Swiss-Prot record:
Organism: Wolinella succinogenes (strain ATCC 29543 / DSM 1740 / CCUG 13145 / JCM 31913 / LMG 7466 / NCTC 11488 / FDC 602W) (Vibrio succinogenes)
Subunit field text: Monomer.
Cofactor: Zn(2+)
Name of the gene this protein is made from: ileS
Protein name from the UniProt record: Isoleucine--tRNA ligase
Annotated cofactor note: Binds 1 zinc ion per subunit.
Length: 915
């Protein structure tokens, strides 16, 4: 008789091959039709806990790159983790729509001349259309990644109500006395003709001129030193700023020396400067820096006075200890200039060219020939004009700030700009914005925790925030100024009237509407006496106001303010995290977030930055086409995202192999629980079942705890270890005999199936945040006992496995016993003395007892107390000897165990199973 038909073989319709690239789009379309995000909200109505992740808006320009995919998948995984823990979650995606990159794309399409000839309203219309086009493109690309959120109602910073909210945030800051217009040096992109914020500056290596220049001391300073001739030696890498020099700064309370060659430098630097050949001879005298304070040197380029001042910013570890000071070209220079009331000379225009100031103020010989010349072009001529005052000229490579868009070196340039003040006391609070922000950072939870120091040090050391830009596409700094008095109009009625217009018409109205229209009735009589400010806001102010425009708006269901989490790349400590913190602290005096999580950047498998020229770019669309988004999602979750993440074809293949193992495990569990209609009572579980349930509970609880700390890679390691060892390595092997050969409804078979069902149910809910598609697919092929009423993945809630009575047997010892046993069996197989373990009976040492399941645990036919049959091998464990004997009974033709009394006769168990 063929007994195959009598065996309960595993069966499932869940396919072994995932065919992810073909099947994922169909599944996501189904989710979209079913409005799963709305379903998620409904499923958690009345939930005790809430979690909202406020989306840092990607820029609405260009297609997605792998960094976007990393960011959105990580956000989606975290939101889903909290959802599957039973919390109400909110995730409203958004887009950053204003700013220079879009304006540059429009200029690229039109050509610069045509763009410059168009009215601002038309340029803004084209920018708006460009942003809308790429929002649609990026939205589609995000959805392909399996990301779930309120994509039907995303936020866009260019929406009219949003622009009004940004403007209202600006007005609130102004009314608190934290906004000021000042002439101050700022990062200036001459290539883009606009001021830049710190977050818009990137540091790159640059080759610069390194020059040491002699500034002769004037009469009173020489008399103070008792000499007839002496020079201060300054060092600079920006010789083009020398025409605007008005001072030389020394370090307070520092010793300076006059050398026998007439040069004055800091004493600490004499040895270094002598080695460089900048100074020579011996020290004639030493004196404190205060000796020369407020006396004069002479600028060798133009003969103008250069006052000697003291500044804490002066370092004596490099340079000369004498710092060339031009308040129009540097933050430190500007600060020391305020203290000494120094003039601010600014001879450079917005394109980085010398203007008529160079001629009017006689800042250079033959000044008229320099007007209109680019500063970097003029530099060589300036060095030539120094003559003997140029003591040494070399070139150095150093890290230098560059514009994030043009990638050209930036300059410091004093212009009239608008600033959010960091150190002004906030009205009614008694603390500065800096103080409040630093306090709020201490209350914020950081992942990784060193983020607290990084953001804190940036806030501690940052200057006032320059929020004005000289461009077209952005929210205007829409204030009126009195033409006669220069008074700024911060009247609440005026500001709110303008905000109301922006809400209805958008902020294009600032350009298209006249003063009378923009003013409330009580102010219309002053329309002709007022002028508009035409700067626009830094885009970081836009994104820094999203908490106000989204979290505090009834237009979005975005959850609470402050948000549970902000999550972005680690570069956003100087970007969005900081701008959001400052805007929120300025207005509401607390942070807009409870926690911040940062991730690293994507690099190739060698750790190198991706670039088209290297040919190492991995595009999300290519990964989806070849592997599917589940593999990309598993790559994100398996990686240590706190560092830079390596990605390549080889790495993705390894991830795909890991996915295959997880999928096959799910498939095996589905196949072996296919006919289970109800869960067995826990008391029916065997010792081995209870051991397995304990192992599963511990592993999945630990995984969920790690996921709760956002340590997904360690959580997945925990799952993989459990699958490889306790589940696939031991339990599934042990259970095959019961599952296939016990009676269909036998207590032992149903108990094992129930242990698997409990485990699979918890495993699916654990994996759901990462492998959402796969879990949803698995549920379609699962029986009702597994589904527990869930129609889709979004109906799941993670519940720990039930607590079972602890096994009475020491399974730690049994695992050691099993490992030692299989070590011996492997040797016997290599010697070809054994084909499989069922040919073996295990003889226990005296006084050792079988707990009733040891034969199953060891996968042998019988466990014996007395020897019978040929001894094949033996081994010792904990001083006890275990013997492997060849089975003496006959092989059952159905279960293949050597337990039948006669050849070709069913064993007692199998005979009962088939009736």
């Amino acid at each position: 008789m063929d007994y195959k038909e009598t065996i309960e073989l595993p069966s499932t319709t869940f396919p072994m091959r995932a065919s992810l690239p073909e099947n994922e789009p169909k599944r996501y379309e189904k989710w979209r039709e079913e409005k799963v995000y709305a379903k998620m909200q409904k499923n958690r109505e009345g939930a005790k806990e809430c979690f909202n992740l406020h989306d840092g808006p990607p820029y609405a320009n260009g297609h997605l790159h792998i960094g976007h995919a990393l960011n959105k998948i990580l956000k989606d995984t975290i939101v889903k983790y909290h959802y599957f823990q039973g919390k109400k979650v909110s995730y409203v995606p958004g887009w950053d729509c204003h700013g220079l990159p879009i304006e540059q794309q429009v200029e690229k399409k039109l050509g610069k001349e045509k763009k410059d000839s168009l009215p601002k309203e038309k340029i803004r219309e084209l920018c708006r259309a460009h942003a809308a086009e790429f929002i649609a493109i990026q939205k589609s690309e995000f959805l392909e990644l399996g990301v779930v959120g309120d994509f039907e109602n995303p936020y866009k910073t260019m929406d009219f109500p949003f622009e009004a909210a940004i403007y209202r945030a600006l007005c609130q800051i102004a009314q608190k006395g934290l906004l000021a217009e000042r002439s101050k040096p700022v990062y200036w992109s001459w290539a883009c003709k606009t001021a830049l914020a710190e977050a818009e500056v990137e540091y790159q290596d640059k080759v610069s001129d390194s020059v040491y220049v002699a500034f002769p001391l004037q009469k009173e300073a020489l008399e103070r030193l008792g000499v007839k001739r002496a020079v201060l030696v300054i060092w600079t890498t920006t010789p083009w700023t020398l025409p605007a020099n008005v001072a030389v700064a020394l370090r307070p309370k520092e010793l300076y020396v006059l050398m026998s060659d007439g040069k004055v430098v800091a004493k600490n630097l004499v040895e270094k400067l002598t080695a460089l050949g900048v100074v020579g001879g011996s020290i004639l005298q030493e004196f404190d820096s205060s000796t020369l304070e407020n006396l004069l040197a002479q600028n060798p380029l133009n003969g103008r006075d250069s006052r000697i001042v003291l500044g804490e910013h002066v370092e004596v570890s490099d340079g000369t200890g004498c710092v060339h000071t031009a308040p129009g070209h540097g933050e430190d220079d500007y600060r020391v200039g305020l203290r000494y009331n120094l003039p601010v000379l600014m001879p450079v225009d917005d394109e980085g060219r010398f203007d008529e100031t160079i001629q009017r103020e006689s800042l250079l010989p033959e000044a008229d020939s320099f007007v209109g010349m680019h500063i970097f072009e003029a530099q060589k001529r300036i060095l030539g004009l120094l003559g003997d005052a140029l003591l040494k000229h070399t070139q150095i490579t150093h890290s230098y700030p560059h514009c994030w868009r043009s990638h050209e070196p930036v300059i410091f340039r004093a212009t009239k700009q608008w600033f959010v003040l960091m150190d002004e006391s906030i009205q009614g609070v008694g603390k500065s914005l800096r103080e409040i922000a630093l306090e709020e950072i201490q209350k914020t939870c950081f992942y990784p925790d060193h983020g607290i120091k990084r953001l804190g040090s940036m806030i501690e050391n940052r200057p006032d925030w320059c929020i004005s830009r000289q461009r077209d596409w952005g929210v205007p700094i829409a204030f009126f100024r009195d033409r006669q008095s220069g008074e700024m109009i911060f009247d609440a009625e005026v500001l709110e009237h303008i905000a109301g217009i922006f809400e209805q018409e958008g902020c294009d109205a600032w350009w298209s509407r006249d003063n009378a229209y923009l003013l409330p009735a009580s102010w219309k009589n002053r329309a002709d006496s007022l002028e508009k400010i035409h700067h626009i806001l830094d885009v970081w102010f836009d994104s820094g106001s999203t908490w106000k425009a989204v979290l505090l708006s009834s237009a979005y269901e975005a959850g609470n303010y402050p948000a549970s989490m902000y999550l972005e790349g680690s570069d956003q400590h100087r970007g969005w995290f900081q701008s959001s913190l400052l805007v929120s602290c300025a207005i509401n005096h607390h942070a807009p977030y409870q926690s911040i999580l940062t991730h690293g950047f994507t690099v190739d498998e060698k750790g190198e930055k991706m670039s088209k020229s290297k040919g190492n770019v991995i595009a999300p669309k290519d990964v989806l086409k070849e592997f599917g988004s589940e593999i990309l999602r598993l790559w994100v979750a398996s990686s240590d995202y706190q560092s830079d993440l390596k990605i390549s074809q080889n790495i993705l293949k390894q991830v795909a192999e890991n996915y295959r193992k997880i999928r096959n495990t799910i498939r095996f569990l589905l196949a072996n629980t296919n006919d289970l209609e109800r869960l067995s009572p826990l008391e029916d579980l065997s010792e081995i079942d209870r051991w397995f349930m304990q192992e599963a509970r511990v592993a999945l609880e630990e995984t969920n705890a790690l996921f709760g700390r956002y340590d997904f890679s360690k959580g997945l390691q925990e799952i993989n270890y459990f699958i490889t060892n306790a589940l696939s390595g031991i339990y599934l092997d042990l259970c095959k005999d019961s599952l296939y050969c016990d009676g269909k409804n036998s207590k032992t078979r149903r108990a094992s199936q129930s242990a698997m069902a409990y485990t699979l149910r918890a495993l699916l809910a654990t994996l759901a945040p990462v492998l959402t598609y796969t879990v949803d697919e698995a549920l379609e092929h699962a029986g009702e006992v597994l589904k527990g009423g869930a129609q889709s993945v979004f109906d799941l809630v993670y519940e720990p496995l039930p607590l079972v009575e602890a096994p009475k047997v020491d399974f730690v010892k049994l695992e050691e016993l099993r490992a030692k046993f299989f070590e011996v069996v492997d040797g016997l197989k290599k010697e070809k003395r054994l084909k499989n373990t069922l040919e073996v009976n295990l003889l226990l040492p005296p006084k050792e007892e079988d707990f009733g399941g040891l034969a199953k645990w060891m996968m042998v036919s019988e466990v014996l107390k007395e020897a019978k049959g040929e001894e094949l091998a033996s081994f010792e464990l904990a001083g006890l000897t275990y013997r492997l004997l060849r089975a003496t009974l006959h092989r059952c033709p159905r279960c293949w165990q050597f337990v039948s009394p006669k050849e070709e006769t069913l064993c007692e168990r199998c005979a009962g199973a088939i009736g």
